[in-house]
Amino acid sequence: MDPEPPEPSTGVDSVPRQPPSAHSGPDAQAPSAGGASGTMSQDTEVDMKEVELNEMEPEKQPMNAASGAAVAVVAAGGAEKNGLVKIKVAGSRGWVRTRWALLLLFWLGWLGMLAGAVVIIVRAPRCRELPAQSWWHKGALYRIGDLQAFQGRDAGDLAGLKGRLDYLSTLKVKGIVLGPIHENQEDDVAGTNLEQIHPALGSKEDFDSLLQSAKKKSIRVILDLTPNYRGQNPWFLPDEITTVATKVEDALKFWMQAGVDGFQFRDVGNLTNASSFLAKWQDMTKNISEDRLLIAGTESSDLHQIRSLLESTKDLLLTSSYLSNPSFTGKHVEFLVTQYLNTTGSRWCSWSLSQTGLLTSFVPAQLLRLYQLLLFTLPGTPVFSYGDEIGLEAAVPPGQPLKAPVMLWDESSFPNTSRSVSSSKTVKAQSQDPGSLLSLFRRLSDQRSKERSLLHGDFHILSSGPDLFSYVRQWDQNERFLVVLNFGNVGQPAKLGTSSLPTSTSLPARVDLMLSTQPGRKESASVELEHLTLEPHEGLLLRFPYVA
């Protein structure tokens, strides 16, 4: 017989077979129990080693195309099988229902959020539209009538004023009312040139430089063009008014081209046909820019004359002596303010005690802080003269004409008079004292320029005691402010009545104290209105939040 052909090679060496044992065979006897156990243990150990070698041998073989393809085919087959299983599971009824349920929940949740947003928008109170405001609506104006007195004794010019702009910036004023600074021969129309700066005060180049520097600090410059400011009649004689008016109109064009932001005319009560001239000059400034301001000043406190002047022009600021009444009681000041607001109607007001003078000329020293708080929180533009922020007093020696007081920057500014002046009255000393009049002025000016309720908020007077004047300033959903002023010489409980408030406004039980005119009171504290008591001559600025 032919021999059987050998088995084909698989590419892996076969393990050689062991020769049969000498004891194998049908006739062989089984060994003893002990010998059998030892032999089996050895055989098992040998077999395990052979198995490990067989498992390690393929790992030692080099990879070739055939083996790589085989592995890839196996992997692909496994992945295809897993994918088919996932497709079958995803297409099952349970998963289809689950996906539809989740999709439905998503859209229901989205529609619910949309409906909630619509309800919130519809039910939320609408914000009031902000009124159109110009720069003079947003803060105080600062008058520098005598440039030399403002800077020092008989030494001051436009270049020196430029060096004081940093100080003016700390006061947060929005504009300075400068001058008059033009050439004026006393009571001489021909010798008056409204377009020429007095040589002692500087040149046109100095003025242009001042304008540019002031604008960089967001301070506007208003120029006083009162023609005959050195003479007896500020507007010359009535039969010269035509010539004067022509000079004024030419000067308006000249200075507007130079970049001046506004103009002031004082003592308009002495100007023949003042209403018609003011209206014409206002039109001239508005034709150039709506952002130009016109200020008129009068010493009159007659409401009929004041209303006539205000009705003649649009956006006219009028300074007067209306509030300079010798009666300093809360009820009387409340009456004056109420009458003025009722007379002016919706027109924008300005608040001062005169067209040129200092607060100390009209208000007792103990009420200076109170009047600062009053002027800064009434609805309108507060107008101050230089020195009002430090309580500057006009020193007039007996028998001498009234002169503009020298600004007290430091001890070196003290006037050469026999009257003693305290060093605490200077700008230098008060700048270092957080409880000073100057510090109070700066804080009030800062609040006035950034709080909407104080900028253009509604004004509501509260009923209170005879020596008290109290009111609320509020705008839409912004923080509200409560002002309580005690003009009396003794401490008094507030006892605020709210019957005059609109139904949408009410006073809370507790309010926050922003500031007091008396340095001793603890600020930033919560105050219970029912037990609120004011010290003599004390004013409080309190605030409380809007509640829907």
Regions found by a protein language model. Name each.
Residues 140-142, 176-178, 221-223, 263-265, ...:
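Hydrophobic faces of well-ordered beta-strands that scaffold small-molecule active sites
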Residues 154-168, 241-256, 364-372:
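Short, acidic/polar
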Residues 172-173, 251, 256-261, 352, ...:
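Short loop/turn motifs at secondary-structure junctions
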Residues 146, 180, 223-229, 267-269, ...:
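A cross-domain feature marking catalytic cores of carbohydrate-active enzymes
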Residues 149-152, 165-209, 219, 230-238, ...:
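Aromatic-lined carbohydrate-binding/catalytic grooves of carbohydrate-active enzymes
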Residues 1-177, 183, 208-214, 275-284, ...:
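Carbohydrate-interacting/catalytic domains
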Residues 244-304:
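Active-site neighborhood of glycoside hydrolase catalytic domains
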Residues 232, 236-238, 259, 282-409:
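Conserved alpha/beta catalytic core and glycan-binding cleft of carbohydrate-active enzymes
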